[in-house]
């Protein structure tokens, strides 16, 4: 337990609960109980990371409520030295800091109240007219007072102004809240506060129990695991339990039906008690009920269609697989037959040889016919050219009629492109073809 007097510990607790957050309150309570703690022990007791613990300690040290000391220590089973940070409270410094802050707080409120009092102005007690501090400068009388410019009555200070009333109310509220702290400071001034440096804090330090330390470690590990789970990347899981989903859907449908039955309007709301006809609310409820029924039926029909399509696809793929299997077996059997046929050699028969010789003879005759036709055509072309090279026939009186007829007959023969030699050649060519 700390060596500080009870009134000092009470003062520190009052200050922490009046002006600080919950985590700062827990931190200072732990230091007051154990007198001195390391950063690791404090983090374990509070169940927070060491980094956050040091951040809290830095804030309290800035306000001069906490003292921090670092030193090198040797841990058990290790030869390397480590820097260890200790937290403790220097009571004299803490009390002085509290006094100074309370003085600054009260002074700030009083200064604001004084400013409001200086600017409160003046008021006429007869006509209740108010004047500011600048307006009354032109209303000075020979006696050195201020007179009203309306009725001439002497002006008085406005003690009931809104600013003055709010300032007095603010100061009274503050003094009521800090009255306990001021009383504690007065009682602390009546006693002698012992010095609490780092050595004395270590001498009066209360060790952390193993049960508390183990419990804090479990809480810290649990909090860290929760943080890791909350900050981990999202994962996707696929659940193939179709039966479970079916049961859940069935339960949801049952719940919907029960809720729909509960939400049905009473009979005296749905139908008129006088005429017995359906009211507007009843018609609306009936339309909504029919819409829900149609929606459920459509969903069921859709599920049935999907099931039938799935069964048809399964049957189609089964037939396709059977057909592919039969085709593969048939191809295997054909490959076996081809391998057996390859074992035998092809034999050339006499008939095939005779057919080949016949084909060769027919090709030879066709070639000869083409050659003879080309010779005949050449002869015709040659005769036409010779005919064109002859000199023109000039008719004279000394030529007889018989000569004229002979020349005309030759001309006709040449023009037609035929002569007796050509006809004989054609007959011979026909004979050769036969």
UniProtKB/Swiss-Prot annotation:
Its main location: nucleus. It is found in: Nucleus. Belongs to the TFIIE alpha subunit family. TFIIE is a tetramer of two alpha (tfa1) and two beta (tfa2) subunits. Recruits TFIIH to the initiation complex and stimulates the RNA polymerase II C-terminal domain kinase and DNA-dependent ATPase activities of TFIIH. Both TFIIH and TFIIE are required for promoter clearance by RNA polymerase. PROSITE patterns: HTH_TFE_IIE. Residues 241-251, 376-385 have a biased composition (Basic and acidic residues). Residues 419-434 have a biased composition (Acidic residues). Keywords: Metal-binding, Nucleus, Transcription, Transcription regulation, Zinc, Zinc-finger. InterPro entries: TFE, TFIIE/TFIIEa_HTH, TFIIE_asu, TFIIEa/SarR/Rpc3_HTH_dom, Znf_RING/FYVE/PHD. The gene is tfa1. SUPFAM superfamilies: Zinc beta-ribbon. GO terms for molecular function: RNA polymerase II general transcription initiation factor activity; zinc ion binding. Residues 226-238, 386-399 have a biased composition (Polar residues). GO terms for biological process: transcription initiation at RNA polymerase II promoter. One of its GO terms (cellular component) is transcription factor TFIIE complex. Residues 8-99 form the HTH TFE/IIEalpha-type domain. This is Transcription initiation factor IIE subunit alpha. It holds the Pfam family TFIIE_alpha. Transmembrane segments: none annotated. Residues 217-251, 357-408, 415-434 are annotated as: Disordered. A zinc finger (C4-type) spans 124-151.
């Amino acid at each position: 337990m700390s060596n500080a007097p009870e009134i000092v510990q009470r003062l520190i607790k009052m200050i922490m609960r009046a002006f600080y957050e919950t985590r700062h309150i827990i931190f200072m309570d732990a230091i007051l109980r154990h007198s001195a703690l390391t950063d690791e022990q404090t983090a374990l007791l509070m169940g927070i990371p060491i980094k956050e613990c040091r951040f809290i300690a830095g804030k309290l040290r800035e306000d001069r409520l906490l003292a921090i000391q670092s030193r090198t220590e040797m841990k058990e089973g290790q030869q390397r030295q480590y820097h260890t940070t200790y937290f403790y409270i220097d009571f004299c410094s803490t009390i002085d800091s509290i006094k100074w802050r309370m003085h600054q707080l009260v002074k700030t409120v009083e200064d604001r109240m004084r400013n409001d009092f200086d600017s409160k102005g003046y008021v006429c007690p007869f006509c209740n007219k108010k004047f500011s501090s600048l307006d009354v400068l032109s209303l000075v009388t020979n006696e050195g007072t201020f007179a009203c410019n309306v009725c001439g009555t002497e002006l008085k200070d406005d003690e009931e102004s809104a600013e003055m009333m709010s300032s007095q109310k603010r100061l009274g509220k503050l003094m009521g809240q800090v009255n306990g702290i001021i009383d504690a400071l007065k009682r602390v001034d009546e006693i002698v506060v012992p010095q609490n440096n780092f050595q004395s804090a270590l001498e009066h330090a209360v060790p952390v129990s193993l049960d508390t330390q183990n419990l804090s470690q479990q809480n810290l590990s649990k909090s860290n695991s929760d943080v890791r789970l909350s900050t981990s990347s999202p994962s996707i899981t696929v659940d193939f339990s179709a039966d479970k989903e079916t049961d859940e859907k069935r339960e949801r449908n049952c719940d919907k039906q029960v809720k729909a039955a509960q939400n049905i309007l009473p009979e005296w709301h749905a139908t008129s008690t006088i005429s017995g006809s359906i009211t507007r609310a009843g018609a609306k409820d009936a339309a909504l009920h029919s819409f829900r029924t149609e929606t459920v039926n459509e969903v069921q029909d859709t599920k049935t269609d999907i099931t039938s399509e799935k069964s048809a696809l399964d049957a189609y793929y089964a037939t396709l697989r059977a057909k592919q299997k039969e085709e593969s077996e048939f191809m295997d059997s054909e490959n076996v037959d081809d391998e057996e046929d390859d074992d035998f050699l092809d034999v050339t028969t006499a008939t095939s040889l005779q057919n080949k010789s016949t084909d060769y003879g027919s090709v030879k005759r066709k070639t000869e016919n083409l050659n003879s036709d080309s010779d005949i055509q050449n002869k015709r072309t040659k005769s036409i050219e010779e005919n064109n090279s002859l000199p023109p026939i000039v008719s004279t009186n000394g030529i007889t009629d018989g000569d004229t007829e002979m020349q005309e007959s030759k001309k006709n023969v040449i023009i037609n492109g035929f002569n007796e030699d050509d006809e004989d050649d054609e007959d011979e060519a026909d004979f050769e073809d036969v």
